[in-house]
Amino acid sequence: VYDVSVNGKRVGNHELKPGWTDYRKEVSFQVFDIAPLLRKGKNEIQVQLSRGWWAGEISREVYGAHPQLSLWARIEVDGSCVAKTDSTWVYSLNGPLIAGDIYDGEIYDARRVPADWESAVENKSVQVSLVPFEGPEVRVRDEHLWQKPQSIVIYHDTVDTGTKYGK
C-alpha cells in the first residue's frame, strides 16, 4: 500500500493503492496525471510505502519481508519527453510511517523526519508481468453520504439489558 505526493501535494484521491494482487503472478501498475502538481525548476516525488498487501498481515510475508516499489515518471510537453525518472532515487526506512496494514491499521509519527537516506537499488531478480490495475478504487466516502444514528441507548448495568451474564 502506498501514497504518492509531488511537491508536497497528494496524487490521486483513493486509498489502499494499488489493490490486492498475487505478486507471484503479476504486479498491478497505476497511471496518474501529475502535470497540475509540477512547477518550474526542480520537482520532488515522494512515496510512502507500507508493508500493506505485500508483507502485512493479509499476506504474512509470503512475497517477502520488506515492501518493494517501482516508480517511473515521464514528463511530456507537446508529445516530446522533456524529463523522466533516473537512477538517482534515494530512500529511508526511518520516515513517519512506522506501520501500515489493512488489518492492523496505521502507526504514523509526524515527529519522525526521514533520515539515513540511501541510494535505491534496482532489483532485477523479479520476473513477473506488469498489468494495469483493474477494479474499483477505494475512496473515502463524502460526508453527505454518512448516516447519523437513528437512536442512542446507553446501558448502565447488565440489568438494563435484560441479561444476567452469569449472575
What is the role of each PLM region?
Residues 126-167:
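Edge strands and adjacent loops of beta-rich recognition modules
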Residues 1-122:
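Accessory beta-strand-rich segments of carbohydrate-active enzymes
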